[in-house]
């Protein structure tokens, strides 16, 4: 119960998907990049860095043990993979943990956009920030996502599919569009 992941948010995570191709082969997009981002987060929140080789070994193992749960190509679904590192240890007080646990779990998931790829209305909500400047916004930690729960629910209640977050300092520039990429086009330039 007395662990830094529960009390102070010392945890990091990644998210990958395994897709079965038409040829039956399983594919994952750039897992080395996820390993590198997890290492960046670990440095930022004072957790040990998991070597890329260990990350990839764990990924291979979790896929091998769960190969029967990777949906068929025709389904459009995938196997979601969640690598996670948490700070443990018996301590209360804001400081790095004395122990850490790395784990990976998987779950089959359907297509992210249930109605396919099409334009979707999104809300700009100036009263909310997804991440604070000079804080943990550059790291993949849960605290950055819990901050978006209220604005996300409000956007859905107003009929929008998601929130476009503006920069926290000036509220002038697009900072993030959670579930998708954002492209702005004016005339013939973007």
PLM region descriptions:
Residues 1-62, 84, 91-190:
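Helix-start/capping segments and mature chain N-termini
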Residues 72-86:
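Extended, Lys/Arg-enriched charged tracts that mediate electrostatic binding to polyanionic substrates
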């Amino acid at each position: 119960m007395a662990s830094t992941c529960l009390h102070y948010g010392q945890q990091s995570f990644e998210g990958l998907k395994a897709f079965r191709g038409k040829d039956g082969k399983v594919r994952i997009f750039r897992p080395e990049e996820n390993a590198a981002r997890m290492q960046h987060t670990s440095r930022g929140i004072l957790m040990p860095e998991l070597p890329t080789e260990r990350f990839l070994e764990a990924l291979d193992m979790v896929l091998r043990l769960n190969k029967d749960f990777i949906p068929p190509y025709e389904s459009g679904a995938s196997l979601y993979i969640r690598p996670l590192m948490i700070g443990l240890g018996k301590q209360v007080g804001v400081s790095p943990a004395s122990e850490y646990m790395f784990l990976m779990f998987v779950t089959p998931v359907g297509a992210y956009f249930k109605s396919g790829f099409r334009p979707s209305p999104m809300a700009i909500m100036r009263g909310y920030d997804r991440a604070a400047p000079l804080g943990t916004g550059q790291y993949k930690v849960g605290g950055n996502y819990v901050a978006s729960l209220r604005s996300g629910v409000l956007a859905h209640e107003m009929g929008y599919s998601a929130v476009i977050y503006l920069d926290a300092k000036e509220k002038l520039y697009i900072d993030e569009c959670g579930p998708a990429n954002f492209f702005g086009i004016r005339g013939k330039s973007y």
